[in-house]
From Swiss-Prot:
Hydrogencarbonate binds at residues 95, 167, 176, 337. Signal peptide: none annotated. Binds 2 magnesium ions per subunit. Is also active with manganese (in vitro). It catalyses: ATP = 3',5'-cyclic AMP + diphosphate. Its cofactor is Mg(2+); Mn(2+). One of its GO terms (cellular component) is cytoskeleton. It is an enzyme of class 4 (lyase). Catalyzes the formation of the signaling molecule cAMP. May function as sensor that mediates responses to changes in cellular bicarbonate and CO(2) levels. Has a critical role in mammalian spermatogenesis by producing the cAMP which regulates cAMP-responsive nuclear factors indispensable for sperm maturation in the epididymis. Induces capacitation, the maturational process that sperm undergo prior to fertilization. Involved in ciliary beat regulation. The lineage of its organism: Eukaryota, Metazoa, Chordata, Craniata, Vertebrata. One of its GO terms (molecular function) is magnesium ion binding. It is a peripheral membrane protein. Belongs to the adenylyl cyclase class-4/guanylyl cyclase family. This is Adenylate cyclase type 10.
């Protein structure tokens, strides 16, 4: 047979008909319900195996890219093939039931014989579809088919708005039984079908012990033509397409608009489907892997085969079921005859219908249905199974015939529970645990082996509210371990301590209320409070309520009084009765005892008076009694009443408590979720009471979340990536953190290893940044890690994409509830925002919102900000500041609020919304409050829609994907886009240049700077000029530049500071992820490299590392080709890796990466000495060639060549520094070659900036190596270049760069006076140029010079500016260096600018900061300075702690001032420790001293150390020598240090040297507590400024290094 081609008009009625069988579409039914019809036909039941397992595989998938859409594609690929076969053979698909379908061939009885043959042929062809195929998800799809024939009844039932139908009869039972007998790839005929078929045509085999038979194959007679046979059969099929419609699969495709028929058919289709019926992408739109609750209801009848008997019962049951579902927001998805009985598949949580307390609703609904249906006449047994979890909800089938259905293990489980546990309501463990209902509402059931269910877990019978309340069930419940600390809740506990103090010293009641959303840890706070509240004469009563408590009158007070009276521990009512009698005998007449019967479940005789009393009067009598009892107790004890989940306090209990706090002194502490509805008047009165303290609980702070993760994993340390993911994802909510952690453990992506010290770790690229977040030391000491050797660290398995991880079901469910409660327009905005990412701009959102105007978007955004879906921020700094700290807890003064006039409240709300709209307009950044909401909303998009949206975003962002106007709009990797063509938009570069010109920007190639000429002679610095004259000329030039910058009307300085960081965050980062989502890996790689380069510019090594790892994954996916663009990307990748390694001080790794990059850039660096000297010779000739102006004849390099040359200069600039670190003799030649290659490469670029940088590097290299003539020459050449520059734009920046670099060079060489002169000018330039990073560097270098030169007034002024920069720009380096200098002032200058405690607090607070942690120099200096402080105080335990931390950072060698400052401080600490060892006559003191002296000598000998550090190093060497008794060497080193200090102008060191020299050679001994006495008298800077302390007297506050005698010999 030929497969017909499908073509039809897509009217709405056709789309509705696609959800229904022909039996309904063409049926003519009476409007009365129930309605019965009878006919004959053949039934086919097809059961498809493998789909449930596939659903489970997708629902438990780690990543968001394996969603429902892929699943529905796979499902429908297979199911549509079956549907097509059925339709081709004339069948009518009656129902889809998950992964099964029921088809009907409706014909006259006399035609059954031939039609059965057709159906068998169809069945065999269906098997043929699946026989040899192994499907794409690795799942083997197979089918089982049962056939039956005979008399069939149809029942139509429903109400005015909804209709359902069932097929009933022996044939229906037979087809189900036949399918159950079938094995994979079998076709089973029911006994009746076998009787009615043409037996001569079928080869069968018998089924053991059954009358049914199995079909082997058809055996038609010779010359039998099946096509002709089938054509004859189609004449008996009333709705088989023929004639002009013969190419259609289904005649219903030809339906024309018919309002009456359409209205009739709509009743059979779910409302959520009808809402979307106009959406032509309906099939995918409603397809989700979604957490839902399944309620499977089975009704068994006394006589199932008689439709007229069971019809009315089904109608009655349906009417009640649908009314109850409407109340609880559930829907009937399917109704069908299931084995024995009629089954209703009800679902809670369909798309758009997710509500809170879904599980409770489902159970209550199930119980209601059970109770009602059990009473319906003709219904023999009611069985209900309830299961919760992720299932596939979506449209399954073929384009012309499909249905909305649910598939998944939980659907199967609910069905099996319903059949294996008849006559009761059962539920699974997920429903039991998630309902939060009391345990006594359930009873655990014995396990049964259920078909198709491997492991059901514990199953429960749901009783509902039929059991009596049991005492002792209301105690506080918390899963926290006893020794588990309460993290991050000090503020909340302080509120309690303060209120408790008020309660104890006053004679009035106090109420403390903690309000917080679920998951914030309210129960843990109460558990801690219960422990802290314990004391003499304190009576603590703690109870926990639940949803049911709210509906039980006086329940809270019942539990309270049961505890007060000691009844909660009584095991029998008689014991309770005796206790009660003893307690109330003096307070209550015996005839009133029976008042206590109902409330305390006792059995006192009922008196006549009480029997006549009204319920209200009984309640009042009880309250009077309870008040009397409490009045007696409070005289002897302080009552503290703790209530968890107080939102469930019933109104009667609220009234009693309100009266209680007015009458007696009692302390009530409650935790509660925000009230959904307005609370009762008594509750409001309690909240507004003058003695009520109402606290809204905030989130836990990031540091505490980090500690929680370590404690929960039982490790001492976690990776930064894991910490960031859990910290950001949890939003500081403990429950979210726990769920995310469980999700990671479930997917087995966490790896645990034994702790390894930093020194022993063999550093590779993959472990460069591991184990960065440690458990807070105090917690480490008091909790889980007593055995240091057994400490573990946790990191992630390689290749895990945390950004794409699908959220845990529990958190997804919370987000779906929020989404489904929104208006459709709000949902659409949230979903569009989710495509952009966690953070987005209003401009981009407006671009992708379909058909919205700006006013509408702003109004919707304001509403969503008010609803805590979004936060809004004015700029990136505001956002980053907010991300560092979660919203803390705060107190709400409801009493004050209630006293305000209520007039104009509505007006006030409108005004507030308008203000919010204005705020949104001003804000540049919007961010999801909860990352899980963004992920959940993102997953709701279809794949094609998602791609289209990502493409839209990418096109919009692409135009701005470059550096800011301040930085002249370049690439972060110079000339990157000229080398790699990654643009989506058709705009060519010429057009862009024209646009740039029209906006007043000069393109890069137009700048004068690009063509740099090498001056022919020293026009500016004639040879006869002295160094002093040259110095004067340089300083005057910088002064001239500064004057012009300050006074010129020209556009010399930028109007705003650098915005590159903003652009990186809101343009380039999202753009890379959009390309990644689009599968454009080459474009994504381009932007990941740009991002890594940008982060390196911003000194964020960790983030650069992370994005290079992202790039590495993409590099592996790209097809290997030899194109220059791909080679350049690889070279850039390795050069950036080299930069990261260099910045981290991993110089061996850096060298390897940089060499590899140079090789790819066609600039091979030699590996052996022969090649080395050959290269040196070649580079010398090249340099001679450039210097002699021969190179100027060649045209400027092209843009691609420039990109290559710029990369080479970066690599070579780092390489010469790396080789300079080495003590090996031949390495100086490698360093010389590298710096020469850098200079020649820079000259080839013909770019002034590159040439100047290279000259200054060449000068510094020779300066450090001691070649005076060479370094001076190239420094002068660099200066000659800047004299030629136009003083605007980049020219000004080059001048500032030269000034700053000269400051570094002069400082490191020890020319402090000149460094100060240059530094003050460089500082002013960078301040005017508004570049925070450069500004910071100039402040640091100048402050270091001023400190060494002891110019304290100027130093304090510079430190003030450094502090201002750190605060206004949120600049962590500035703050860290500020405190580093403050520690130096404390240790060496003799006064206090910031206290030691403040400096220490900064270290504790920021040592795990992402940027600071991976900047080894500053932390090394801070740790070492603190270690020195403790060594001077002889607090050796603290010394070891900080010294060891510093020691771990020593291997990270970087050629920075901070690193060498840090290492000199570290060595000083070790020298002080040596003094301790010698004093204590330690065995290894001699060896330690010798090793220390050797290390100090090596540091002095190393070129890169710089002469400025030599006075301190010689000073320390002198001290080591005097400690070891070598007076001669000590004198030599002292004199060298003094001479160098004098030459350099290092007054700080010179004074200290003289004082120590005098002390060492004097006969007087120093006091043991010398430093302690000194720090107690250290003056503050304020005292010095006020003139109360003479600045000259500060010298006496310097620490004197202790040495006993000069002739101390070992």
């Amino acid at each position: 047979m030929n497969t017909p081609k499908e073509e039809f008009q897509d009217w709405p009625i056709v789309r509705i008909a696609a959800h229904l069988p022909d039996l309904i579409v063409y049926g003519h039914f009476s409007p009365e319900r129930p309605f019965m019809d009878y006919f004959d036909g053949v039934l086919m039941f097809v059961d498809i195996s493998g789909f449930t397992a596939m659903t489970e595989k997708f629902s438990s998938a780690m990543y968001m890219d394996r969603g429902a859409e892929q699943l529905v594609e796979i499902l429908n690929y297979h199911i549509s093939a079956i549907v097509e076969k059925v339709l081709i053979f004339g069948g009518d698909i009656l129902k889809f039931a998950g992964d099964a379908l029921l088809a009907l061939w409706r014909v006259e009885r006399k035609q059954l014989k031939n039609i059965i043959t057709v159906v068998i042929k169809c069945s065999l062809e269906i098997h043929g579809l699946f026989e040899t195929q192994e499907w794409e998800e690795g799942l083997d799809i197979r089918v089982k088919i049962g056939l039956a024939a005979g008399h069939i009844s149809m029942l139509v039932f429903g109400d005015e708005t909804h209709s359902h139908f069932l097929v009933i009869g022996q044939a229906v039972d037979d087809v189900r039984l036949a399918q159950n007998m079938a094995q994979m790839n079998d076709v089973i005929l029911s006994p009746n079908c076998w009787q009615l078929c043409d037996r001569s045509m079928i080869e069968i085999e018998s089924v053991p012990d059954q009358r049914a038979v199995k079909v082997n194959f058809l055996k038609p007679p010779p010359n039998f033509n099946f096509d002709e046979f089938f054509t004859k059969c189609t004449t008996f099929m009333h709705y088989y397409p023929s004639g002009e419609h013969k190419n259609l699969l289904r005649l219903a495709c030809t339906l024309k608009p018919d309002p009456e028929l359409e209205m009739s058919l709509q009743k059979y289709v779910m409302e959520s489907i009808l809402k979307q019926i106009d959406n032509k992408q309906l099939q995918g739109y409603l397809s989700e892997l979604r957490p839902v609750t399944i309620v499977f209801v089975n009704l068994m009848f006394e006589d199932q085969d008689k439709a007229e008997e069971i019809g009315p019962a089904i109608q009655d049951a349906y009417m009640h079921i649908t009314s109850v579902l409407k109340i609880f927001q559930g829907q009937i998805n399917k109704v069908f005859m299931f084995d024995k009985g009629c089954s209703f598949l009800c679902v809670f949580g369909f798309p758009g219908e997710k509500v809170p307390d879904e599980l409770t609703h489902a159970l209550e609904c199930a119980m209601d249905i059970f109770d009602f249906c059990s009473q319906v006449h003709k219904i023999q047994t009611v069985s209900i199974g309830v299961a919760s979890g992720i299932v596939f909800c979506g449209i399954v089938g073929h384009t012309v015939r499909h249905e909305y259905t649910v598939i998944g293990q939980k659907v199967n489980l609910a069905a099996r529970m319903m059949m294996y546990y008849p006559g009761i309501v059962t539920c699974d463990s997920v429903t039991y645990n998630g309902s939060n209902l009391p345990a006594y509402f359930f009873k655990e059931l014995p396990k049964k082996v259920m078909k198709g269910v491997a492991d059901s877990g514990p199953l429960y019978q749901y009783w509902g509210r039929t059991e009596k309340v049991m005492f002792g069930m209301a105690c506080l419940i918390c899963n926290r371990k006893e020794d588990y600390p309460l993290l991050g809740r000090n503020k909340e506990i302080n509120y309690f301590m303060y209120t408790m103090k008020k309660f104890l010293i006053s004679n009035s009641s106090q109420v403390l209320m903690y309000e917080g959303l679920p998951g914030y840890g309210k129960s843990q706070i109460l558990m801690k409070i219960e422990y802290l509240a314990q004391g003499k004469n304190h009576r603590i009563i703690a109870i926990s309520l639940n949803k049911i408590s709210f509906h039980q009158t006086f329940y809270t007070i019942q539990m309270f009084m049961a505890n007060v009276l000691g009844l909660d521990t009584c095991k029998h009512y008689k014991e309770r009765q005796t206790n009660l009698r003893n307690k109330v005998m003096t307070l209550l007449d015996e005839k009133f005892y029976c008042l206590l019967n109902d409330i305390f479940h006792v059995q006192f005789p009922i008196s006549r008076e009480i029997s006549r009393m009204s319920t209200l009067k009984k309640q009042k009598q009880l309250e009077i009694l309870f008040m009397k009892i409490l009045k007696l107790i409070v005289k002897e004890e302080r009552i503290i009443f703790i209530i968890d989940e107080a939102q469930f306090v019933d109104s009667t209990s609220w009234r009693f408590m309100e009266k209680l706090i007015r009458t007696l002194p009692i302390f009530i502490i409650m935790s509660l979720c925000p009230f959904v509805n307005i609370p009762c008047a008594a509750a409001r009165a309690v909240i507004k009471n003058r003695n009520t303290t109402y606290i809204v609980i905030g989130a836990v702070q990031p540091n505490d979340i980090s500690n929680k993760i370590c404690l929960d994993l039982n490790v001492s340390c976690i990776s930064k990536e894991l910490d960031s993911y859990l910290g950001e994802g949890s939003c500081g909510i403990p429950f979210y953190c726990e769920e995310l952690l469980k999700n990671l453990e479930h997917h087995e992506v966490l790896v645990f290893q034994q702790t390894e010290s930093e020194e022993k770790t063999n550093r590779t690229w993959n472990n460069l940044f591991k184990y960065s977040i440690k458990l807070t030391e105090k917690l480490n000491m008091v909790t889980l890690h007593s055995d240091k050797e057994s400490e573990e660290v946790c990191h992630l398995t390689s290749g895990v994409r945390l950004k794409n991880l699908s959220p845990p079901t529990s958190l997804k469910e919370i987000s779906l509830i929020q989404l489904d409660s929104m208006r459709l327009s709000h949902q659409m905005l949230v979903r569009c925002a989710a495509i952009i990412g966690l953070t987005f701009t209003t401009e981009l959102l407006f671009e992708i919102l379909p058909c919205w105007n700006m006013k509408m978007m702003i109004k919707t955004l304001a509403t969503l900000v008010e609803s805590n879906i979004f936060y809004c921020f004015r700029n990136g700094k505001e956002l980053q500041k907010a991300l560092k700290q979660n919203d803390p807890s705060f107190e709400v003064h409801y009493r004050s609020l209630s006293l305000k006039p209520s007039e104009g409240m509505d007006h006030g709300e409108e005004e507030q919304l308008r203000e919010l709209e204005n705020e949104v307009i001003e804000c540049h950044r919007i961010r999801f409050c909860n990352p899980m909401m963004q992920k959940t909303a993102y997953e709701l998009w279809l794949k094609d829609q998602r791609k289209a949206m990502h493409l839209k975003c990418a096109r919009f962002l692409e135009e701005d994907a470059h550096r800011c106007d301040h930085c002249r709009g370049r690439d972060f990797i110079p000339y990157h886009h000229f080398t790699v063509n990654i643009r989506l938009n058709a705009l060519d570069m010429d057009a862009i240049k024209k646009m740039a010109m029209s906006h007043g920007f000069k393109t890069e190639e137009k700048l004068i700077l690009s063509n740099s000429e090498i001056p022919e002679t020293s026009a500016f610095f004639p040879e006869n000029r002295s160094p002093e004259e040259i110095r004067e000329k340089i300083l005057n030039f910088f002064d001239h530049v500064l004057t012009k910058m300050k006074t010129s009307d020209e556009d010399i300085i930028p109007l705003e500071s650098c915005q590159c960081e903003e652009i990186l965050e809101i343009v380039i980062l999202p753009l890379a992820h959009h390309f990644l989502a689009l599968g454009e890996n080459d474009k994504a790689l381009y932007y990941f490299l740009e991002i890594a380069s940008a982060y390196l510019i911003f000194c964020d090594n960790y983030m650069a590392y992370m994005y290079l790892n992202e790039g590495q994954k993409l590099l592996k996916t790209l097809k290997k080709d030899k194109s220059w663009s791909q080679t350049f990307e690889s070279a850039t990748f390795y050069s950036l890796k080299g930069e990261v390694c260099f910045n981290m001080g991993q110089i061996v790794l850096a060298k390897k990466m940089l060499r590899k990059a140079l090789k790819l850039l066609n600039r091979i660096f030699p590996y052996n000495l022969i090649s080395l000297f050959l290269h040196i010779h070649v580079e010398k000739n090249r340099h001679f060639h450039y210097v002699n102006r021969q190179a100027q004849e060649s045209p400027p390099p092209g843009k691609k060549r420039l990109a290559q040359l710029y990369r080479q200069t970066v690599c070579l600039s780092l390489l010469w520094r790396i080789y300079s670190y080495s003590y090996l003799f031949h390495c100086k030649y490698y360093a010389h070659l590298a710096v020469m290659m850098q200079m020649n490469t820079a000259l080839e670029t013909q770019n002034c900036f590159q040439i100047i940088k290279a000259y200054l590097d060449y000068s510094l290299y020779h300066h450090l190596a001691g070649y005076k003539g060479v370094w001076f020459k190239y420094e002068v050449m660099a200066m000659e270049h800047i004299f030629n520059l136009p003083l605007k734009g980049e020219g000004i920046e080059i001048v500032a760069y030269v000034a700053e670099t000269l400051v570094f060079n002069k400082l490191i060489m020890g020319h402090l006076d000149l460094a100060i002169e240059l530094g003050s000018r460089a500082l002013q330039m960078w301040a005017l140029l508004q570049n925070p990073n450069r500004h910071y560097q100039s402040l640091c270098r100048l402050s270091r010079c001023l400190l060494l030169n002891s110019r304290y007034p100027q130093l304090i002024q510079v430190l003030g500016r450094l502090w201002e920069l750190s605060v206004t720009q949120e600049h962590i380096f500035s703050k860290a260096f500020f405190y580093f200098v403050c520690l130096d002032i404390l240790l060496y200058s003799g006064f206090v600018y910031r206290t030691f405690e403040e400096c220490l607090e900064f270290i504790h607070q920021y040592e795990n900061n992402r940027i600071l942690k991976f900047h080894s120099g500053l932390l090394l200096g801070l740790y070492s300075s603190v270690a020195i402080w403790y060594a001077r105080l002889q607090e050796w335990d603290n010394f070891y702690k900080f010294s060891n931390r510093a020691k771990n950072l020593l291997p990270r060698r970087t050629m920075t001032l901070t690193y060498y400052d840090g290492i000199s401080r570290y060595m000083e600490g070790q020298v002080l420790h040596l003094q301790k060892q010698i004093k204590e006559q330690s065995e290894n003191a001699q060896a330690s001293g010798e090793e220390l002296l050797k290390n100090l000598e090596n540091l002095v000998a190393q070129n890169t150390t710089g002469p400025v550090f030599c006075p301190r190093l010689y000073h320390l060497m002198a001290y080591v020598c005097i400690l070891m008794g070598d007076g001669q060497k000590c004198g030599l080193f002292l004199n060298t240090a003094l001479r160098l200090s004098e030459t350099q102008g290092n007054i700080l060191e010179k004074c200290w040297l003289n004082m120590n020299k005098e002390s060492w050679y004097s006969t007087s001994e120093l006091k043991e507590d010398q430093w302690l006495q000194t720090i107690l008298s250290l003056p503050s800077w304020e005292k010095i400024v006020a003139g109360r302390v003479n600045i000259q007297d500060l010298q006496k506050n310097k620490f004197l290094m202790r040495a006993n005698t000069v002739d101390n010999h070992f």
